[in-house]
Amino acid sequence: MATSAAAVQEDPATNFAKDQLRAIIERIERLEEEKKTISDDIRDVYAEAKGNGFDVKALRTIVRMRKQDANERAEQETILETYMQALGML
């Protein structure tokens, strides 16, 4: 049973798909590494803030709130206030 060179070579479409898949995986890996670096940088900033006497939990809350839409944030604050009043916390 003889194998020809054409039979051993892969289809060009298969090669293209493999190359494309490899490129996608490598991009994801690079982005994951960048994400890790950025996460480390953010952690360092919070540590610096804590060292300067700031409350990290409050900072995280403010960052999260600033990401929200103003109307969404106002609605959540209203609900929170209503619940706190119902529990006698205000």
Curated annotation (Swiss-Prot):
Protein's UniProt name: UPF0335 protein Rpal_4670
InterPro entries: GapR-like, GapR-like_DNA-bd
One Pfam match: GapR_DNA-bd
MF-aspect GO terms: DNA binding
Family note: Belongs to the UPF0335 family.
Organism: Rhodopseudomonas palustris (strain TIE-1)
Lineage of producing organism: Bacteria, Pseudomonadati, Pseudomonadota, Alphaproteobacteria, Hyphomicrobiales
Lineage top rank: taxon: Bacteria
